[in-house]
Amino acid sequence: MYEYAIAWEWLAFAARWFHVITAIAWIGSSFYFIALDLGLVKRPHLPPGAYGEEWQVHGGGFYHIQKYLVAPAQMPEHLTWFKYESYFTWLSGFLMLCIVYYGGADLFLIDSHVLDISAPAAILISLASLAVGWIVYDLLCKSPLGKNTWGLMVVLYAVIVFMGWGYTQLFTGRAAFLHLGAFTATIMSANVFMIIIPNQKIVVADLIAGRTPDAKYGAIAKQRSLHNNYLTLPVIFFMLSNHYPLAFGTAYNWVIAALVFLMGVTIRHWFNTTHARKGRPTWTWIVTVILFILIMWLSTVPKVLTGEKDTQAVAPAFQQFAADAHFHAVKQLVGTRCSMCHAAEPVYEGLARPPKNVLLETDAEIAAHAREIYIQAGRSHAMPPGNVTDITPDERKLLVAWFQSAIAGKQE
């Protein structure tokens, strides 16, 4: 029988790959149409009903694009809708959330030092936060506040900052950042699925029927598109953050997250202004650099300890790994081959934090990361990188034997 751990690892990889592919498609088409729309030029010779045009060159050919706010005289039977990129990005991201964070909740989702809850409770909180977050956002947009574009943006930013702080009070730092990205992406994809596309269909149907569309549908869709425009870059940051513990695994991670959203605004403002041919506001890059330097500084600020934490107890979900007969030898192996990097204060040159914030110093930490040790150093040679600590083939076999023995013992 094919090993469950190996199959699960490949399933996670497939979901991540699919998620990246669909995200590239969604973000690429989104950025393209934003640039196209802002760069449209009104010329005298445009056909009746045309709002503007753009000439582009790519791949050895020329493209002449015209935008109509009313139905053109010759309406084609087929219209290309840009929506499935968004839907599949969210679905693949949710699948990855289920595989990695729900399937491995005891390790990746729950930090008992932050909040000691069961895996089912943590998963329910996660799901509820995504659903409630969209409802709150949608109600704010539909409230009287929604008529004030910038006032709404400020309130939404406050909501996002609160969610970032809240997630760090519930989950591991890595899961908190992932959830903040998922929360934001849920808003963006729901905007497309529940607001933008339905409103566009109403407008298209009216135009084809020769009716004058209600301007409110376009205004609402434009507002949601504006939000998506400025939220895109922070979501990408949170997608990548689990590789960088200095972002998610530090004392002021929620403040870092808040600043990332401001960086997303300054960067997108430069591109939006440039595409609209309204100049190149270089001040946005100065602000972005200042924010990034502030983030770097925050990542090194020490955490003020408020009490003693018991880090020695092995969680029940991982007891079989610590109780296995191979564990004593594995602990010695990890101590000599891995802990110079995977320590609270790494001694390996150039490391300020342990890779992915994975600590392998105590029985509890080694047992909790048994599957990762098995995959990374037992079944593959990914760890240590370049085999810098000279782990031997026999030692890798020991790691495999330990994991398989513990799993077999649990199943008996």
Q: What spans do the regions from the language model cover?
A:
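Short, strongly hydrophobic alpha-helical membrane anchors
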Residues: M1-A12
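Alpha-helical transmembrane segments
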Residues: F13-I27, A119-S129, R174-F193
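Membrane-interface amphipathic/juxtamembrane segments adjacent to transmembrane helices
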Residues: S30-A73
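Membrane-water interface of transmembrane alpha-helices
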Residues: S30-V41, A131-V136, V192-L207
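Loop-to-transmembrane boundary segments
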Residues: L69-F94, Q200, A215-P234
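Aromatic- and Gly/Pro-enriched helix-to-coil junctions and flexible linker segments
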Residues: Q74, W81, Y101, G279-T284, ...
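Alpha-helical transmembrane segments and their membrane-interface junctions
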Residues: W81, S86-A105, G164-L178, L231-T250
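Membrane-interfacial entry segments at the cytosolic side of transmembrane helices
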Residues: G146-V154, G249-N253, H275-V289
